[in-house]
């Protein structure tokens, strides 16, 4: 067998080193330099398992067990387990607290992975209503309506799921209202915090949630794949049931999950997370500044206003107009940004785009704003 492996050698990526990255799916997962130094010794497979007694969450060296206890405090929950991502966390809950054929009531902004997870768990779903263009906000009262409808139809409801912050518009849902509805109706409540936990303050108990699904690589300054599942103790027996064959292994975790760099990167970045969520108001302020400065150019921010999250989605008819006469067509914006050392915007997109300035300095934010202004003013 002959395989040419030259293409796999010297693979490089310079986006973070040489450019300002505006990709909202990546801004929250950028690992601080000090964390990169700590994880150097854990490159190898199963590197965290040197002193394992049979289960990942009980490892004392490195102190994974203590980290998970501290993370529970950070999220305002009782018990935390590492997973490979928020989608795996959601599936673990669905596959344990629901019975086959049950309904999951979820919001109209739910991520595709919520649907994939419930399909894999052989569940049905009922989608709640959201506001129409241009806000697209979740309507909490719709949960009560959909629950009543399913109950009247004698359908079994297994779970209430809410996307805390959706990836399309960056809207922050009213968790307390939905949580109150879930509690009053007597159903378990799962909050998808893929775009919130690690970026902004979260307290599960204050929010009335039973489960939190978090993403390490999306919002917690960690390498991927890595996530967390945080639960209330009342659901410990259901969600963390152990194997009949190997009594120490938890079924929904398939024994153990993140066994190397991802979990260590999350641990190494924990101090950074604790400090950065304290600056959330400043992140929102920077985001609102971007919107206020760019809308007069012909950008139209969609989603709730004013912004309460760092994800920004712009409709950009002005870019479409420029693309019609520019010989580069829809690629001009990407190329002009690249010339100015800015990346993370999808190539060829001019009708609309998403961006985030989360974690950037004020001077970097100003540079991004001024760069976009100069592109529009030069080419319009």
From Swiss-Prot:
Annotated binding of pyridoxal 5'-phosphate, by residue: 86-87, 192, 215-217
Keywords from the named record: Protein biosynthesis, Pyridoxal phosphate, Transferase
Keyword Transferase assigned: yes
Keyword Signal: no
InterPro entries named among the record's database cross-references: PyrdxlP-dep_Trfase, PyrdxlP-dep_Trfase_major, PyrdxlP-dep_Trfase_small, Sep_Cys-tRNA_synth_arc, SepSecS/SepCysS
GO molecular function (one): Sep-tRNA:Cys-tRNA synthase activity
Subunit structure: Homodimer. Interacts with SepRS.
UniProt name for this protein: O-phospho-L-seryl-tRNA:Cys-tRNA synthase
Organism: Methanococcus maripaludis (strain C6 / ATCC BAA-1332)
């Amino acid at each position: 067998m002959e395989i040419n492996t030259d293409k796999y050698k010297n693979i490089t990526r310079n986006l973070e080193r040489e450019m300002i990255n505006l990709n909202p799916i990546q801004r929250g997962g950028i690992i601080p330099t000090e964390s990169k130094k700590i994880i150097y010794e854990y490159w190898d497979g199963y590197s965290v398992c040197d002193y394992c007694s049979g289960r990942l969450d009980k490892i004392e060296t490195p102190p994974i067990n203590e980290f998970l206890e501290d993370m529970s405090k950070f999220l305002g929950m009782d018990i935390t387990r590492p997973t490979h991502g928020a989608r795996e966390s959601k599936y673990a809950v669905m596959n344990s607290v629901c019975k086959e054929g049950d309904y999951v009531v979820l919001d109209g902004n739910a991520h595709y992975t919520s649907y994939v997870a419930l399909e894999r768990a052989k569940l049905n779903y009922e989608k709640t209503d959201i506001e129409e263009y241009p806000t697209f906000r979740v309507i909490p009262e719709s949960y009560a309506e959909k629950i009543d409808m399913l109950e009247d139809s004698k359908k079994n409801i297994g779970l209430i799921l809410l996307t805390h912050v959706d990836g399309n518009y960056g809207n922050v849902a009213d968790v307390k209202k939905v949580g109150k509805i879930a509690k009053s109706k007597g159903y378990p409540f799962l909050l998808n915090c893929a775009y919130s936990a690690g970026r902004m303050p979260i307290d599960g108990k204050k929010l009335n949630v039973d489960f939190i699904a978090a993403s390490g690589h999306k919002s917690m300054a960690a390498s991927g794949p890595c996530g967390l599942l945080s639960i209330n103790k009342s659901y410990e027996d259901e969600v963390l049931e152990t194997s009949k064959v190997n009594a120490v292994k938890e079924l929904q975790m398939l024994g153990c999950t993140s066994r190397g760099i991802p979990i260590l990167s999350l641990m190494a970045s924990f101090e950074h997370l604790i400090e950065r969520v304290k600056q959330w108001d400043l992140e929102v302020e920077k985001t609102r500044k971007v919107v206020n400065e760019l809308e007069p150019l012909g950008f139209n921010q969609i989603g709730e206003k004013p912004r309460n999250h760092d994800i920004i989605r712009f409709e950009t008819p002005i870019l479409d107009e420029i693309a019609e006469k520019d010989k580069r067509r829809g690629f001009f914006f990407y190329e002009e940004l690249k010339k100015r050392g800015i990346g993370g915007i999808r190539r060829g997109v001019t009708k609309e785009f998403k961006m985030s300035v989360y974690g950037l300095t004020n001077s970097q934010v100003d540079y991004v704003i001024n760069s976009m202004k100069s592109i529009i003013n030069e080419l319009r």
